[in-house]
């Protein structure tokens, strides 16, 4: 069997070479338990999947991630016997080291890495780049970078770019807000532009797996920003919304697919797309995907992709579960760590812990909002449950504060509207549940308020990491009650590592049995933001309450 030979036709242009011709009309499919690998269509030949149909009709799904991970998806997908497949070679090494980089001595490189708290593992790791020009990106990418006003690559970008452009498998560990998305998106553009053009029936060339639909949407925005000039098409595939539009996007052909694992398996299992053309694979927020129970789906997906692909894994932490996944599916990978691989907070965030009772929380919250409103800043308020988020939003709106709630029970249309209101500044207060702490990317959030302390310190670190992003500073207030004392010892460790003030009451809780809140996984969901009175989105629940006499 083979994927078929190359036929004529020109590939994409660009400074990394003109690409290759398209794939020829191979006729063999891959048998697996009665279903052919690729849904009955040959690789490069045959008919496309049709029109997909459907529109944005029907209700929008509820749960965060659309409940993808809760079902036995992919039960019909068998592992491909890649030893029996004649794989067509593809290009993945595009890196030409800039003379300025080559001329740097080892001591200069070590000094730069030390200044960025960067550690490296692996053989023959390329030197980092210190400017965008040194990375050797095509002009169409450089022009977009300059439009965004960045002065230099972030720490993770400076090392990940030469690694990824070299075709290496890569593990990158860095805190949230460190520029990881651009770290893998820009090399993806270069990779795709050197591959043969898509043929009818082909699936994506670059596949990016993400834990939540919000993160998938945000990655798609970044990919569209940089890929538009070379006419790269993207699609985002996630649960909680009708499948019809996503099927249509897949069947029209998209070089880049950003997907949550459950919905992607659903699409592949139903023959709506295939992963035969994937040669560039990214697992973003790998630790979070495993936290949310996606490991079985991830393993099924990776078994459907050719083993000589390039694989990049990005994660905020490096627990044993992520290490095991990397060991199973990455080949001779290089690793870059920014900061410690232990759980640590963003040092650009000032952490203020206020010990109080449940009854005192609302009074403290109003006091903090009065301060924040005077600065005209944006704030996210995190709660432990959807009910608390709704109750608190109702209270704030009736008291004159322009708050909006977002969580897993909100329909996708309303969630999108709330996020737009928050980003625009029309709704500067967003009340959210914990899962949103990983899916939200708004760079100008000045404050985070943990109205409820999370059930684990990992969520605490990621929630306060919604502020202090992209080199900015931020402030995080956390209300800590005696009921949270089990998390005191781990919280003290996080505060001490970041050189933050530790309240005396917290130290006492830590001494007297307050340890072991754990870094376990939570299943909470949601996110919210906004301000009433601007229409659209079909507001429900607390978001539909009129704002009282304005206090903002």
Curated annotation (Swiss-Prot):
Spans annotated as RNA-binding RGG-box: 517-537
Keywords: ATP-binding, Cytoplasm, Helicase, Hydrolase, Nonsense-mediated mRNA decay, Nucleotide-binding, Nucleus, Ribosome biogenesis, RNA-binding, rRNA processing
Family matches, as InterPro entries: DEAD/DEAH_box_helicase_dom, Helicase_ATP-bd, Helicase_C-like, P-loop_NTPase, RNA-helicase_DEAD-box_CS, RNA_helicase_DEAD_Q_motif
Main subcellular location of this protein, as a coarse class: cytoplasm
Family matches, as Pfam families: DEAD, Helicase_C
Short sequence motif named Q motif, residue ranges: 130-158
EC number: 3.6.4.13
Biased composition (Polar residues): 542-552
SUPFAM superfamilies from the UniProt entry: P-loop containing nucleoside triphosphate hydrolases (SSF52540)
Positions with a binding annotation for ATP: 174-181
Domain remarks in the Swiss-Prot or TrEMBL record: The Q motif is unique to and characteristic of the DEAD box family of RNA helicases and controls ATP binding and hydrolysis.
Family: Belongs to the DEAD box helicase family. DDX5/DBP2 subfamily.
Protein name (record): ATP-dependent RNA helicase DBP2
